[in-house]
């Protein structure tokens, strides 16, 4: 059920329209006081898995993005909490990327040429290198064709890593890793044993590159019931 109606307000942001219902959040396009378009995610805190929060109760997706600044990572704008119908919700405001996901691209074009794959992959690797070499390294955990957007607002498309819902700090316990809802076709073997690392992200990028080149992931048998 859509929680925010058109023209309703969240802090300094006015809702323009509902975008989609995700596994853990709803997303909207909003405008700030200056009239700039932004992307807002709304989280029902009571429905999020406990592994989505740090030891102080802060939502990890917000904590990680707030301190991440890189041209190949979606830009953090603001965050906070609101009450809707006596329930606490967290919101995260991000830049609104004018473009499409790699999944959208494949739906239209079926596959991508090798030069574009090489150039886009270099940019994504730069973003991952930034995350993996932070003082407190971060693992994204969900690099897929759905979670890379091409920013088409300039002369040259710029790939940007989005959706940090499964991102974790590398030094966290494996007990904080919850792979429920992840696409198993992109997961490294160790992830099925609840171990995640920077190498897991590189593996997922390799699967993404294969998918872009051939139009299918390297394996696509029915493993959705694997536990």
Please report, for each region that a protein language model flagged, where it lies by residue:
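Conserved activation segment of eukaryotic-like protein kinases, specifically the C-terminal portion
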Residues: 176-190
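Catalytic-loop of the protein kinase fold
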Residues: 132-151
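A short, aromatic-enriched beta-strand patch in the conserved N-lobe beta-sheet
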Residues: 78-81
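Conserved catalytic-loop aspartate of Hanks-type protein kinases
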Residues: 201
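Activation segment signature within eukaryotic-like protein kinase domains
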Residues: 120-121
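AlphaC helix of the protein kinase catalytic domain
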Residues: 102-112
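Conserved short submotifs of the Hanks-type protein kinase catalytic core
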Residues: 85-101
